[in-house]
Amino acid sequence: MKFFIFTCLLAVVLAKHEMDQGSSSEESINVSQQKFKQVKKVAIHPSKEDICSTFCEEAVRNIKEVESAEVPTENKISQFYQKWKFLQYLQALHQGQIVMNPWDQGKTRAYPFIPTVNTEQLSISEESTEVPTEESTEVFTKKTELTEEEKDHQKFLNKIYQYYQTFLWPEYLKTVYQYQKTMTPWNHIKRYF
């Protein structure tokens, strides 16, 4: 930003200098008397360094004046933002909103629905097998050995499960799948016999 201001001021100074040279003949005579010296009928022109140094000094003075004028306004702006603490408001915009659940009257965060992992799904090491006989109602479990990849996957699922246990899920999301039945005409036929 300072470079942009410097270039703008430099352009203004150069444009002003060009306009001053061509504006009036009196000013051009004064400039010529100041800049040129005649010694023994030889005109000595000022070097480019002298011209450049005078323009640069003016530009530097102008930039310092602009910077000194900008500092109080920057301080006022920073004090304004510190006073109102806008950063807290911006942080609040990125957080999830708090929603009241009408079924359990608990505060829950409105996160996108992420399917939860049940503890039954996490126990991959035990597979349940049922005996196909009608007499027996017992359920036998058979233990299997897990490979390293399956163990790593199991650990990952356990971490996910522990992480999502920290969220307060609404009660209706937990119980919807338990009470939901398929709607078919055969389930709802009332017999009047």
From Swiss-Prot:
Q: What is the reported tissue distribution? A: Mammary gland specific. Secreted in milk.
PTM annotation (Phosphoserine): residues: S23, S24, S25, S28, S47, S68, S123, S125, S128, S136
The record's function comment reads: Important role in the capacity of milk to transport calcium phosphate.
Query: Which protein family is it in?
Result: Belongs to the alpha-casein family.
| Annotated compartments | Secreted
Q: Where is the signal peptide?
A: 1-15
GO molecular function, a single term:
zymogen binding
Q: What is this protein called?
A: Alpha-S2-casein
Where does it mainly reside? Answer: secreted
Q: Which UniProt keywords apply?
A: Milk protein, Phosphoprotein, Secreted, Signal
Q: What is one GO cellular-component annotation here?
A: extracellular space
